[in-house]
Amino acid sequence: MIQQQQQFDCVELDELYWFIERKNTEKACKNIYVITMVSRQPRQILGFDVAFDKTSERIQKIINDAAEAEKYCTDGYYGYLGVIYTGKHIYNIHNKKDSFTVEGVNADLRHYIPTLARRSRCFARKLENLRAAISVFVHAYNKFGLAKYHYRLTHKKKEVPFSIIDFI
């Protein structure tokens, strides 16, 4: 993971699930989970894990491996309870207003990685292959996100939009 800062203001956690080999319509027995941890400013993926389960221990490892944040925002999944530092957890079970950034990153993951697209015929054959694809995506996403963040800090005018040309 690329981490440029020591501490972040707000970090969001969420998970998405998908399948290995094929989509089982009767019972999703080979679900895999992609757990992501994203900072709001600058928008970076601070940690992720790809696994067959989404246990509290797995979530705790992602949190421990990243820099500490002022507050942590999550959705209604019970696995987040008790793993985040006391007094720093915003647990919103009713809506996604506190986890909009990580939901957007998960949408980007589904958009840019064909094996995570909802109506796709592409499926990862191995967990390691999906983990490697997400790792490459995270590296490029963080690099582009930091370039965009620094560009916006130096160019305050709204007439000067950030583009891929500025990144290259």
Please report, for each region that a protein language model flagged, where it lies by residue.
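Residue-level recognition of single "structural anchor" positions
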Residues: M1-I168
